[in-house]
Amino acid sequence: IGYRPPEFELYGVSLDDRGARYAEMLKLIRALWTQDSVDFAGRFYTIKGTIEPKPSRPIPIWLGGWGDLSLKRAAQLGDAWVPGPTANLEKLLAAQTKYRACLVDAGKDPSAAPTPLTREVVVADTRERAWELAEKYVMVNYRDEYGGGWKHPLIGSQDQTPVDQLAALTTDRFVIGNPDDCVKAIRRFGDTFGVDRLICRLYFPGMPHDHIMR
C-alpha cells in the first residue's frame, strides 16, 4: 500500500488514507470483475458502468503486508497472503499464525488457502561466488532502496556488509548458495512454512544477464 511520503504527495493523496483506499479499491475491482454493471459510490471512488471482457474465470488476489491490519485485509479481501522476501522464518511463522486466525474470523478455511512465498534467490556454481554476487548486487540495491528515511532491518550504516555478517542477516530470509544450498533452504521453507508456490526474485539491477539466464 506504499510507505514513501513523496510518492503520495506527487498524486495529492494522504498517506494516512492508504489502507482505507486500498481496501476500497479491492472491493471495487472484484465488483467490476464479477458484476454485469457496477454503481459504486465510496469514500475515494465513484464509478457507474462496467468493464468488458470480464475474466473467464476468477482471478486470485494475493495480498502482502506484515501488520495486523494488513493480515486482516488479506484474509477478508484476498485469496492468499503472500509474504515479501525479507522476513526471516520466525517472523513468517508468527505472521502466518495471525493470518490463519484472521481467515477463521472471516469464515474461511485456512487449509484451503494457498501458501505462496517470495524470496530473494542467488544461486551460483560455488557458495563463495553466490555470496559475492549477493553482496555486490542484492545488498547494494537494498541500501539504495531503503537507506533513506525508512530503515529496513537488513540495512545498516555500513557501505559494505562483511560476508560473515551478510550470512547472519540473510539466514532464513534469502536463498543464497550453490545449488545444493538453495535446495536445502527451499525445502526448509516447505517443511516449516508449508510454501506451495515459491516466487524467486533472481534478477537485481546490474547483475550480469548471462548469469541470470543460466
Label the predicted regions:
Residues 1-214:
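Active-site-adjacent structural elements that line small-molecule/cofactor binding pockets in enzymes
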